[in-house]
């Protein structure tokens, strides 16, 4: 599984997820800096107020 792992509006980068990981995530939230985007492997739990998208194809979280 290949997932994007760049932060916010940085140039696209990808990572190969460890064995057994079959999903990618994209978390989005706002703070004093503006909209923050975090991407990576897996599908983590998030706090209320954080938007989470999980998907199951290569680089689907761009």
From Swiss-Prot:
Gene3D superfamilies: CD59. Its main location: secreted. Residues 1-17 have a biased composition (Polar residues). The keyword S-adenosyl-L-methionine does not apply. The keyword Cytoplasm does not apply. GO terms for cellular component: extracellular region. It is found in: Secreted. Disulfide bonds join 3-24, 17-41, 43-54, 55-60. Expressed by the venom gland. This is Short neurotoxin 1.
């Amino acid at each position: 599984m290949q997932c994007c792992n760049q932060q916010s509006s940085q140039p696209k980068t990808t990572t190969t997820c460890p064995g057994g990981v079959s999903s990618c995530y994209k978390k989005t939230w706002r703070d004093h800096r503006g909209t923050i985007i975090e991407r990576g492997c897996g599908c983590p739990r998030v706090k209320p107020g954080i938007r989470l998208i999980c998907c199951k194809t290569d680089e689907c979280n761009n």
